[in-house]
Swiss-Prot record, chains A, B, C, D, E, F:
SUPFAM superfamilies: Arginase/deacetylase. It is an enzyme of class 3 (hydrolase). This is Arginase 1, mitochondrial. It comes from Oryza sativa subsp. indica (Rice). Mn(2+) 1 binds at residues 159, 183, 187, 268. PROSITE patterns: ARGINASE_1, ARGINASE_2. It is found in: Mitochondrion. One of its GO terms (biological process) is arginine catabolic process.
Length: 340, 340, 340, 340, 340, 340
């Protein structure tokens, strides 16, 4: 029951139709108008929020949520397309207070804003292909960055979205970033089942594009020979769980982003052991504890310019939404790293 | 854990800000731009889909899905805000075939199209109040009706959305409709806990506005004295479950909409007994079976100009999404009534 | 994981102790003091509630909840011991309104009061045996009936409690009653696995004791040869589900209780098909719908002097507590039959 | 997560191996030895059980369970491969008594025996293809029928198994049977996604083979144009749910099997509404109630020579196994029809 | 669906009634009689159990369970009111043996006794306000302590109960105690949403009252600025999870209670990471492992005079009751610390 | 709902029958034929697989799965009888890749083969007693070991199966092995509730038989006085969780099997904390993390000649089958230790 089946079928409809009676030109004009309207909606919200923040004053950087409900580049389950609204709900849910662990006040509007979701399903349902869709994601990210002091904190969606997001961040800032990538998998395969935009290939695309200087992968415990070879080829620093007890000290005192445009943090919720985050598509036992992740994030030194939290799959969560709370706390603590 | 808590908090932010340093004018201009962009996005998708349908030809009326993910006017739980994407997923899910029970082919693009969701949460999060929000819903419905041969089939959301939807349908067609309303509750209270837009009051607003000639309520089994008095006041035909075995024959041979602008069908998923539809906010035992509902719908005579399926709450569904399948089949069978 | 395992073990402790060093007399005195204190607590609550009702005036009969959290006489699962607080929660839960289907206002304190639970586990844990425990249940019921205008509406617990409850009702009123008994099973076996107080034997005890004139059993679909023979022996009117479509008309126009002390209604939640009430210990497909039960109850003529709702097992309910809502609605509609 | 993925992958291993270094002959000899051993195991158990029954005497026909844990011919989910042990557990589970509704004693060994499962996964894992696998199923059924007075009552598995089972029954008895087929779907498509053994095609195979004279399909509510055309082509009597209220009387007084070799009953658990049987792969609302099914079965006149209960999917059942109990009760009541 | 909604509504009834026709005096007399009966029931059980223990001889201190099913002072969910019977069930459940990890035999009646629950809901339902209710809790604790060698081990309920319990312990012993408090939250706010008895304020009340000399808080990871300031104001030793890896050694070798009346241990189940204890109202990732908690408890030196296990919420537990088993093991290991 | 209830009842049937009319001889002959056929089926599959492996060449040792679906020797729940097919499904499930953590390729047929399940239930259902059944398990293991290069990796079933498995391994190899036993319980009681084949006694049987030289037990946290005494009596090295932080270093550098016939690894899934493996019969908080287990296994030096993974109970697993994935990963990583 893929989350985007409707879109998938419509693409066929649209193709069939256009093959039959509608000119390609007319179709593409229609699609472009839909895409433009989508970006306009994000732009107007970013503008409004940023104006308000600037009126308040005293903010240097402020985390701004942008949802990318895209699940169709997953190899196994497509539920992450449903994640953004569930994460937002959990962020503001009354079961916890409004402070982060180190004392940032989320109730202060200068700390966290939101520009809503890129209308991914609506665009796909108009027959727009993946190349162009990935560009829409990139454009959306840039639209947010356009508005000072907003910095994009992206809610996935599957991990395929990290490629267009990091590309946009790097292009907008004018150079590569350092990436801290927490994940059970390296997501660095050349292509997965022929899909170059697969959620298992995003970091191959990022490294090929030169959007990152250093790439540190932490939490890895499902990796093939090709995954290790690609890691070497791109100079990736892969920290596997097998040796985490030895690497822990180093990982709890990272310093990143100097000499480049800053730090990007990409958190795949499955970096956590499934005991801590059961609501993921790929259950891979032997992962990090939630505290392990916080220890790494809290102690990281560097200017965090953007980030993402991806691969939370609400269709696999417990009935009480434990993983939604986990994803939300990750977003909250990342917000504390970004906003200042 | 209300589905729209984020929005709720932001409204306060926005008010605080505007009270402090931002002029009301500037804020309203920003909100208007966001609303305009939202409507533009729906318009562009409706245009594109309708153009394609018209190019195909031979269609007199075609059901067009419009999601309204609004849950904050509910008195108990707000999960219906998450329903539209789950219903879409279930409509196209591979577990069933593409024919309706009476043989309509949903794979034929002339039968069913989709213009996506009204970005309710994004608009609320900009501080837009309910009056204006309800207008946005109405405008969205009219935008769809603008494009021949599209007819709106709205995915809720809670039942408060039926008011702006029916209002739009009636205003656009230029006169009242007949309404078949399947529900456990009459939703006709003057106001609920002071909220005139409450999901328990939508049909009071509809009747006051003169948007309906006849209103038939079927499945009723949770009704107070006020509910029965309001029913009498507005001339509502209330069929309570207590007497369903006697009313069944009449309800399985309805003829509606003659002399007015057509028939509107509003299906609250909780019209069904919770055995058949556990994923609802208000579990009220003693309801209709799914077959009872189909027998009423299949045998209804009349020109169905629009409809809605509301109050499915995915946060209360079974782990297999049984109620999502139920909501989806309701949408499929309503599509068969609308499209021709 | 029996709900009363703690009690079971303590009984052994107490026996061992008393065998060893404590005189039987001393032990029994202690037990008696505990039992007296238990009954005093119920009496004081009944008195206070009844005083308030009488001060209000105009009440002829008022349903009064009495919980009997006893599960250890069940043959399969003992979860019904946890039911009473869950049913109370569901009765007052904000998801439904305060009117019964026929218009009784539960918010009116004259309609429904509550004297809490018999402290079954506490008493058993002091080493009190079943004979004496059953007497405590009977005494508790009589204590409630002592206070005009209270009529006991008992929340089980398993079905073994109907014996001491009906016995108390009959003894207090001074003669037999007619019983409407809704159940998947006849519960009329001479003894089950040697336990004469078994939940499968309560109606054998009732008939032997002469506490009932007529006993109508409806919903029966799990019955052995012995069950049918016992039925004949005691003159029970057994309506099996196999012939329900033929018996329906008769059962929807019952007139009971004339010439005796009134009508007692005992509802085993498993009379319903498990589709409507999954939270029961004995899943027996092929039962009544919730509407079938309401049709029988609403149309019953007779003076209902007391009743019970038993065998709801919260440990088998859905995560949303659907069966708790079902049990609560049964209690609400029975309240409407009793109070006047 | 297909229930037979292991087998699927091994088939590839075996093919690759055999392509490489192992002669086809050697491989086929090995496979044949495995198949022979499998059939021997069933034969020995059938022999032992039948000997014991014959020693007891007085039995004319006795239902004998045969599990066929095959799920790989399903189009959507493959969980039915896990069903047979779960159904057995539920049949003997202590939560219900040992009598069927009409008084057959299942504790009497003359009424119900069991020869275990065909080792489907083990055989497939040796690289055996579907043609041959279907023959193994047929041979297993014949092996049971070989032993008087055993009559096969087959536990699926998906619906694809009905073809080899009915074929075996008909071939063994020397002529066609009449089939009562309860299902949401007609399963009569020529082939499904190219698979002629698909669970959606079994009854096309049966009718083509001449194994049935009359085929009555009851509960149908998901059927395409092709399904109806195939129905006509083969002279199938299709009773759709749309008209069930009209057909009910006729279906509750069926007389079948006269002039042919007897009656075969095939019950797809999804003939029931998902409210009554949520544990199925294809949730199709609007089905029969459990009582509807029992009314049809109890009133059927005819000599039932064999039957099956298929498509129960334990991976979609409720946590309490409600559908397992439903499947088990179907088996119990079918046993009562067969044994005499 | 608050666990005490019934009580809440009744309070209104009682107030309305008393306003109208019943004298305040009469009402208060009735309430007092109910409270007296409640305390008598606890006293009689404590007496009986203590007599038996003393007859056995050789016991210096013995843990005695006292349930306090109070959930209405919670800010978010009120399910902890249902916890005590579930914890008792799990303590004696057959899935584990009767020894604690360090070898205490729970089957020895000298090690663990039980005086049942304070009838919180029954008392509230009579219109008794929180001030008086808290006194009833205190009196119940003192009643247990009256009977040598019983020491109270309290089963919550929400954390608001720790205030009246500690107060009673301190008053009864005649001086302050040292408190080891395991929790995700400091529960030391001056008042929460205006409620001075809130479960978020209990330790503010305790410190103000001078009932504790040292207060050590371990597991803290959701704390606001006010929480830290209150901590300083009262001289609380707050150990936050952020620094747990550094504090671990110190916390695994605590020595408490010297020079005061002993040690009190208060365990909020949410001190554990939700992976280990999902059944809590406030899911706060990043907590202690179960082994972390045991290491702290096993190595603690001091005379433990009383304790509590609070905030287990059965309505959020897994279907198998994992958190019930966790709460039960906490009770078992605390029992081993107390009894000697 | 015991997993083998059917079998249990049949045993009674068979006994009754044989007592009555069938000679013991005839019955035993029938049983022997069934047992022979069962072993033949395993032998033929082992032969075929081993032939193929030998044809491929270059394999010294290859893990070969053998399922033993036996649950009736459990003291609490019997669900482990359903485990083998669920573990197989999870091993090959598409959610993870085919490499083990240290790079073994499971897609290489030389690394992992499968001979299916011992038909335990079928044999028991023929009235075969436990003594003989245990011999069948032993014979099955030897049958696998007969075929070079296969080494048995057994899928339980409850822990009682380790006794016949280890016995077979030791007898076949001609001497004792060293055993690494990961478990929450020592399983070394003389007998449990009179059952010498209990899952709580298997290691007592193994030590008595001299099948092991060293026995290391890791993860122990539920142990009685008898358990510790039996440990001493047999010279078992018991590592309790209470001291795991101190023992960790030693356990992460084990060297076993020198001077004996090799190493046997027995993994009871409940060695893990229930947070990591909720799907077990005995929830015992305070266990190992999944990474702890992998660290011990990865660093173990020794020739692993066979192993088992037992006590996974699918009836207690999460709806997503998290524990199935955990059991499968244990099997995968053990495969990597065995195959070379």
């Amino acid at each position: 029951m893929g989350g985007v089946a409707a879109g998938t079928r419509w693409i066929h409809h649209v193709r069939r139709l256009s093959a039959a009676k509608v000119s390609t030109d007319a179709l593409e004009r229609g699609q472009s108008r839909v895409i433009d309207a989508s970006l306009t909606l994000i732009r107007e919200r970013a503008k409004l929020k940023a104006e308000l923040l600037r009126a308040l004053g005293g903010v240097k950087a402020s985390a701004c949520l942008l949802g990318v409900p895209l699940g169709h580049n997953s190899s196994f389950l497509q539920g992450p397309a449903f994640a953004p609204p569930r994460i937002r709900e959990a962020i503001w849910c009354g079961s916890t207070n409004s402070s982060t662990e180190e004392g940032k006040e989320l109730n202060d509007p200068r700390v966290l804003t939101d520009v809503g979701d890129v209308p991914i399903q609506e665009i796909r349902d108009c027959g727009v292909e993946d190349d162009r869709l990935m560009n829409v994601v990139s454009e959306s990210v840039k639209t947010v960055m356009e508005e000072d002091p907003l910095r994009p904190l992206v809610l996935g969606g599957d991990h395929s979205i990290s490629y267009p997001v990091v590309r946009a961040v790097s292009e907008k800032l004018g150079g590569p970033v350092d990436i801290l990538h927490l994940d059970a998998h390296p997501d660095i395969y050349d292509a997965f089942e022929g899909n170059i935009y697969s959620h298992a290939s995003s970091f191959a695309r990022i490294m090929e594009g030169g959007y990152a200087r250093r790439l540190l992968q932490v939490g890895i415990r499902s990796i093939t020979k090709e995954g290790r070879e690609q890691g070497k080829r791109f100079g990736v620093e892969q920290y596997e769980m097998r040796t985490f007890s030895k690497d822990r000290e180093k990982l709890e005192s990272l310093k990143l982003g100097e000499g480049v445009k800053g730090v990007y943090i990409s958190v795949d919720v499955d970096c956590l052991d499934p005991a801590f985050a059961p609501g993921v598509s790929h259950i891979e036992p032997g992962g990090l504890s939630f505290r392990d992740v916080l220890n790494i994030l809290h102690n990281l030194q560097g200017d965090v310019v953007a980030g993402d939290v991806v691969e939370f799959n609400p269709q696999r969560d417990t009935v009480d939404g434990m993983t939604a709370m986990v994803a939300a706390k990750l977003v909250r603590e990342l917000t504390a790293k970004i906003s200042k």
